[in-house]
A protein has these predicted regions:
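Catalytic-loop region of hydrolases
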Residues: 2-101, 112, 121, 420, ...
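Glycine-rich "HGGG/HGxG" loop immediately N-terminal to the catalytic nucleophile
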Residues: 109-124, 449
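Alpha/beta-hydrolase active-site loop
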Residues: 125-149
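Alpha/beta-hydrolase fold nucleophile elbow
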Residues: 151-165
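Alpha/beta-hydrolase
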Residues: 163, 169-351
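Small-residue-rich helix-loop
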Residues: 322, 329-398
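Short beta-strand/loop motif that positions the catalytic acidic residue
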Residues: 409, 415-417
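Conserved alpha/beta-hydrolase "acid-adjacent" motif
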Residues: 417-418, 422-427
Length: 487
């Protein structure tokens, strides 16, 4: 106990002190890692199929105390695992104090962990991508690590961390494998929304709310979308292509829809990563990008720049126009997830997941949000998914498999949410029980709490991290009371 009081003191002083001056945005102080690979069954659930694939994982054991140090496990989500390593500084701020082993496994079908290389995304190969298979990968790898490092199952407890879909996975790991994971920090994990249990207008309404905090912004955004609609109605695709400096001019309604989606996505991303300092997570963005974008829009129009050009300037805060034009098809991919599938191969895998287990049926109506009407519903999702992946959507399955809103029999999970994050209303915002704790970060965007501490951090995220550390300590203390059990 005394050790832990000391630990808390140490931790808070180290968080408030020297480490605050780390410059996370340039990755200058991102700790080193070893890149390792492990063989995993392609299909954990069909015992007649013994094919395997190579899963990548990153490890740091420089602070690890094998006697009773915990294992900090990041539940890799939809992307290159190195990018999550670079953007999850909170774990590295606290790992040395906890003397933890840090492990980041990569999610199958993302980054380098492609079971069939570039043909992994063929209809007959993609079927091994699922939440269940991924969790089984993690459970198997964590068990192997416990054996390799000769750990006690109890005295070296495994704590799961994750942000966004990674947060969902962290929570699910605790539901499904409590024998392996002692507790989970699920940051910005919209578990209800992705189970299809939220209204379809929720997400973009909350994107709008973020921009509505900036004076004069939303009316200008509406005016700009109206100007786009007017041009499109008159068939003036030439004007739009010129004003938006498109590399490949649009010439029809389909092209125009893509332009709208690309534009809407700029708002989505800026709202999600509305961090208090410049960051390179889903793009290279300035501090408080929502405020920056709004001020620039207000400034531009005040200077007499026409509304469409001002709007294009706003988009260029997020999107590159290095070749002096925008390739909207390169920069935004339309898919089953209107909140964005990301880019490249990762977007293909996420598209498939959005068709199978993660329901992100969200749409805009121009009333509860500031965007043009872009409808999306279960029927459209079904048509798209059948056509693209040959899968029939099973809408109820996520709630059956992962409990829907009936989560109170789970224990030891922190659900943290930032109120600037457009996903926050999709997850638990109140305490469910003594050990299912909700942490609210008033000035936090998408999993700000998982990022490394920064001099510009608002007070609310410092308090949130403190509450999270308290819970983690509780889980570890609980574990240490129990005898050592080896595998
Ligand atoms: C992570 O950061 C390192 C620098 O520490 C950088 O070289 C690398 O490109 C980054 N990786 C990703 C995927 O962002
Ligand atoms: C912008 O373009 C540069 C140079 O082509 C590239 O290195 C960078 O990754 C691009 N950034 C984004 C956010 O696409
Ligand atoms: C907008 O104009 C204000 C007042 O001139 C200035 O302080 C601010 O930096 C400008 N912001 C942007 C993003 O252009
Ligand atoms: C949940 O309970 C913890 C104490 O266990 C408290 O600090 C926190 O504020 C509560 N969360 C909410 C959203 O009320």
């Amino acid at each position: 106990m005394i050790k832990y009081i000391l630990l808390v003191v140490l931790l808070t002083s180290s968080l408030e002190g020297l480490k605050l001056h780390k410059k996370r945005t340039n990755f200058e102080n991102v700790p080193k890692f070893k890149t390792l690979y492990t063989d995993q069954y392609l299909d954990h659930f069909n015992k007649r199929d013994d094919r395997t694939y190579k899963q990548r994982f990153l490890v740091n054991d420089e602070w690890f105390n094998p006697n009773d140090g915990p294992v900090f496990f990041y539940a890799g989500n939809e992307g290159d695992i190195e990018s999550f390593w670079n953007n999850t500084g909170f774990m590295f701020d606290i790992a040395p104090v906890f003397q933890a082993l840090v492990v980041f496994p990569e999610h199958r079908y993302y980054g380098e962990s492609l079971p069939f290389g570039d043909s992994s995304f063929d209809q007959d190969k993609i079927g091994f991508l699922s939440v269940e298979q991924t969790m089984a990968d993690y459970a198997v790898l964590l068990t192997k690590l416990q054996q390799d490092y000769n750990l006690c199952r109890k005295k070296n407890p495994i704590i799961a961390f994750g942000g966004s879909y990674g947060g969902i996975l962290a929570a699910y790991m605790r539901y499904k494998y409590p024998n392996i994971v002692r507790g989970a920090l699920a940051a910005s994990a919209p578990i209800y929304l992705t189970a299809g249990l939220a209204p379809s207008t929720l997400f973009f309404q909350d994107v709008t709310n973020d921009f509505d905090k900036e004076p004069g912004c939303v009316p200008l955004v509406r005016q700009a979308f109206d100007a786009m609609e007017n041009a499109a109605k008159q068939g003036d695709y030439k004007l739009l292509s010129e004003k938006f400096k498109l590399c490949e001019p649009i010439s029809d309604a389909a092209g125009y829809k893509h332009l709208l989606l690309w534009m809407r996505n700029a708002f989505t991303i800026m709202a999600m990563v509305d961090y208090p300092y410049p960051a390179s997570f889903l793009g290279d963005l300035p501090a408080w990008p929502v405020r920056f974008a709004c001020q620039q829009l207000v400034n531009d129009t005040a200077k007499g720049v026409d509304i469409l050009s001002s709007f294009k300037n706003l988009a260029s805060i997020l999107y590159n126009d290095t070749s002096k034009c925008f390739d909207i098809y390169e920069q935004f991919i339309e898919c089953a997830d209107p909140t964005s599938c990301g880019l490249g191969n990762d977007a293909k895998s996420w598209d498939y997941q959005a068709c199978t287990e993660l329901n992100t049926v969200q749409e805009t109506n121009g009333v509860s949000d500031m965007f043009p009407v872009i409808s999306y519903n279960e029927e459209l999702r079904e048509q798209y998914c059948l056509k693209t992946w040959g899968v029939k959507v099973r809408k109820e399955w996520p709630s059956i498999q992962f409990w829907g809103k009936h989560i109170k029999t789970a224990t030891n999970i922190v659900f943290s949410n930032g109120l600037l994050d457009p996903w926050h209303n999709g997850g638990p915002l109140t305490n469910v029980s003594d050990s299912l704790v909700a942490v609210i970060i008033e000035d936090g965007a998408h999993h700000l709490d998982l990022r490394g501490s920064d001099p510009n951090d608002p007070q609310s995220v410092k308090i949130a991290r403190y509450l999270e550390i308290e819970q983690i300590i509780k889980w570890i203390e609980e574990a240490r009371k129990e005898p050592c059990e080896k595998f």
